[in-house]
Amino acid sequence: MNSPAIIPQQDNNLFERIAQTCMETPRVAILMSGTGSNARNILEQRHRYPNFQFVAIATDRPSTHCYALAREFGLAHILVMQWGKIPFDRKAFFDEVAQHFRHMGINFLIYAGFLKVAPKDFLTEFPGINIHPADLTIRDKTGMPKYRGIAALSYALNAGEQYVASSIHVVEEAVDGGLIIAISKHLPIPVHQTYDLRELHEDLKRTCEHPLYPQVLALLSRGQIARDILPLRAEYRNLDELI
């Protein structure tokens, strides 16, 4: 595995706000664009962060399982789309999402496979965390995460990485560039012809992301994550030591 490089400076104020909010009684919305496996996993383990008030699940796609999940867990369902608008009007989209969140008193966001990139003013008003299918401590020559964006797993495979991992980070406007909170254990990449990218992603979610996300939320809810101990690493067991 590659050695981590020095992490560029991020907005520490966002993390401090998140840490403080999570120790109180945050009103939470989950954002998703896909199947919702991480969203379901987080909701099924909500007893681990009992002070969290889950209010809504938001999506940008009608084909997701968002409505079914919201109905199952008694949450509001928010669907915001922009039919036929080319190019995508990011400001208008997030202004509409923000209106919903303000009305519901949302003050903490959990991103679970949400594919839209929010603008800075939205992120400042509604701070949140995201899980990303790559080890974001691996850096490129510019000091930015080497495997960022929607094709991160594909980039890692093409680069010949022998292991993959997932990272939880503060959401900032730079894609996958926010403060790294935790890194999952590393998953070896099987080498055989029938193993495809989708299968790898599902294995990564099941083996790495599903244990990690609720664990980090539980630690945040109890005030056990401080800026000076980040990033936490499941590989080194310092996550387990806090439980």
Residue ranges and their predicted role:
Residues 1-243:
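One-carbon transfer enzymes
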